[in-house]
Curated annotation (Swiss-Prot):
Protein known as: Clamp-binding protein CrfC
Region (G5 motif) location: 331-334
Residues covered by region (G4 motif): 297-300
Chain spans, region Clamp-binding consensus: 41-45
NCBIfam families to which the protein is assigned, alphabetical: PRK09866.1
Ranges of residues in domain Dynamin-type G: 66-402
Keywords: Chromosome partition, Coiled coil, Cytoplasm, DNA replication
Sample GO molecular function, one term: ribosome binding
One cellular-component annotation, GO: cytoplasm
Region feature (G1 motif): 76-83
Quaternary assembly: Forms homooligomers. Binds to the beta sliding clamp processivity factor (DnaN) in the presence and absence of DNA, may bind to the clamp itself as homodimers or trimers. Homooligomers may be able to bind more than 1 clamp complex.
Amino acid sequence: MYTQTLYELSQEAERLLQLSRQQLQLLEKMPLSVPGDDAPQLALPWSQPNIAERHAMLNNELRKISRLEMVLAIVGTMKAGKSTTINAIVGTEVLPNRNRPMTALPTLIRHTPGQKEPVLHFSHVAPIDCLIQQLQQRLRDCDIKHLTDVLEIDKDMRALMQRIENGVAFEKYYLGAQPIFHCLKSLNDLVRLAKALDVDFPFSAYAAIEHIPVIEVEFVHLAGLESYPGQLTLLDTPGPNEAGQPHLQKMLNQQLARASAVLAVLDYTQLKSISDEEVREAILAVGQSVPLYVLVNKFDQQDRNSDDADQVRALISGTLMKGCITPQQIFPVSSMWGYLANRARHELANNGKLPAPEQQRWVEDFAHAALGRRWRHADLADLEHIRHAADQLWEDSLFAQPIQALLHAAYANASLYALRSAAHKLLNYAQQAREYLDFRAHGLNVACEQLRQNIHQVEESLQLLQLNQAQVSGEIKHEIELALTSANHFLRQQQDALNAQLAALFQDDSEPLSEMRTRCETLLQTAQNTISRDFTLRFAELESTLCRVLTDVIRPIEQQVKMELSESGFRPGFHFPVFHGVVPHFNTRQLFSAVISRQDATDEQSTRLGVVRETFSRWLNQPDWGRGNEKSPTETVDYSVLQRALSAEVDLYCQQMAKVLAEQVDESVTAGMNTFFAEFASCLTELQTRLRESLALRQQNESVVRLMQQQLQQTVMTHGWIYTDAQLLRDDIQTLFTAERY
């Protein structure tokens, strides 16, 4: 019964998708515009390029429906540990990890039962072959010395350049982890090399999801489970502006819009950073059309002063994601621990032991994480101890919950996710098409003189918008100056108070150094929390003020435009942008970690030292001071020197923080304002273009106008049917989802 219902729903989804494709083809043929020299060169929502994108979206949904494939898009920055997270989800290493961007092209990772060894299919390799030929010629002509100035040439890049010079093409098929790593690393290095040699990488050739590389492998966490109708596939997406390629943002947006669900990987230590903000904006742009989930990676770096899991969920759900995701869909995890633990358990189950660390480097990482930094090779021979350590590391990784709640659920309900994705895409398409066509149909019924008047009124609104933007900039600048002046005054107060507390603390030179360290850490943590709370409230208030100022300026223009259109008989349905908060969030916990000027930590041992502990260690020339079994320094410690040095570092930190505040607030607000006004102006320009096209069509002979009216009315009606049927489809799918939970 369940299978029959799925089949009927998939047939209905396919019917609606095919009907939508037919309607798009009709739209392409309709004479809805009259070309002229004064036509603005804009990427309008229903221009030919946009219609082509909608065709691609519908074709992609048809492809997923035919397979009943649920595509879970995974997005995150390089530093968030996206590749490690995917490896942890799959249960084995299918993506390479390097300390540089590794996803220049989207990559599909498809769960294939029985496929123990990963295999990569790269059928659409022809554009890469053409690129290699271009690069081959450029390498012959270029100055290698100049190339080294603009490109880091490591051994991988050197091998790729040699391969290009020899004319070695990419294969269409790679079997095994190492050949796959080599292929993916070479593709990403190819992007960097092409940029350095000023050759365009063929990103557009891989816009269609069927053209991107596909890795097929059995997901370890799904091995042995009963089979379900449907297929689960992960989509590794390029991060925003990855590898210095800002146009990857468009590719990312396209891939996210075509996914069945989106999983964002955020960095616990960088939750309020600019890079993670770009990821959040990308997934928020998808809206409510697909389910959203968040993995907060690197949660193993939490300490007693950091936000706990519930606080992280509340921060992301309420503040960072603006209520678009519930706390239940947010999972703090350690992807590295999860990957290492599961890899070790898998090796023990299949081979009875772990490989030698010299043969597979991940074993050393596992031992360090599970056994501690003092592990020995002999420890790996105690299989019962290793098995217990792997289980504990898996438990500590917190990965079991998202595996159960997300991966298992996605696998069991892949067909329903695919159908729900199609239903939501159909609803969005039909709604947008109906609003656009209804506007165009009504435009043919409005008198030419009235259309001219509407065009003139929109032109006046555009001019008023430009005038108001110049005027409001001064007011906003004044508000920013007031906020920064107040923030700097508060920062100086905290600086003075902290230095006074430090001076009082160091007066007692009889206190043991370990107790002094603890009290210093407490003082710094208290100051951090005070500044964090104040800045959160202070800049939330600034954000509200900016929104109010802009709303007061924009609302009269918006209301006037809508009223004038309504008087001409145009129905509401034209959406203007809404100004969102643009004041950056400041992670004072991270900033305070830099209060003491520290050496760049090169290993995990260094990063685990506390701020004050590391400072004392450096001053006493004892790198491991402050750990267990610490030894008291033999030399006399001059507390006055420590106090002066610590106070100097606090002063420097406060100065730097004030500078960062000014730069980031000004940059963020200016960019946000410019974007908002540009989007608002673009909406008005689009409206003006539609009205001009309606006027041009209205001026055609009466028989042509009547024919277009009939065509538009029929098309509007058809899209209304598509919308209604898509609503019914969505409701039926939701009923099945609800039934699956009980």
